[in-house]
Amino acid sequence: MSERNQRKVYVGRVVSDKMDKTITVLVETYKKHPLYGKRVKYSKKYKAHDENNIAKVGDIVKIMETRPLSATKRFRLVEIVEKAVIV
């Protein structure tokens, strides 16, 4: 049997944890403008599976691509890189 394909891994910030076992992660990347060459900030939200509800709003997390878990969930939480600072 062959190994699994390389899966996408993103690092982003949790913007919502209101759903049970699901977090919304905002991933920011930069793309180069095709004509002018300037780097433009680009962001996208992904829903990720958080089995134990450990991630909270503001945490920096790492998510990995997985099989479809629902109509919109295609990622799962790998680790919490940095906990949010509560002021």
UniProtKB/Swiss-Prot annotation:
UniProt keyword annotation of Ribosomal protein present: yes
Organism: Geobacillus sp. (strain WCH70)
Keyword Ribosomal protein applies: yes
Function: One of the primary rRNA binding proteins, it binds specifically to the 5'-end of 16S ribosomal RNA.
GO biological-process terms attached to the record: translation
PANTHER family per UniProt: 40S RIBOSOMAL PROTEIN S11 FAMILY MEMBER (PTHR10744), SMALL RIBOSOMAL SUBUNIT PROTEIN US17M (PTHR10744:SF1)
Source domain of life: Bacteria
Entries under SUPFAM superfamilies matching the protein: Nucleic acid-binding proteins (SSF50249)
PROSITE patterns per UniProt: RIBOSOMAL_S17 (PS00056)
Family listed: Belongs to the universal ribosomal protein uS17 family.
GO cellular component, one term: cytosolic small ribosomal subunit
Family annotation (HAMAP family): Ribosomal_uS17_B (MF_01345_B)
Transmembrane segments: none
Keyword field: Ribonucleoprotein, Ribosomal protein, RNA-binding, rRNA-binding
UniProt protein name: Small ribosomal subunit protein uS17
Subunit field text: Part of the 30S ribosomal subunit.
Molecular function in Gene Ontology: rRNA binding; structural constituent of ribosome
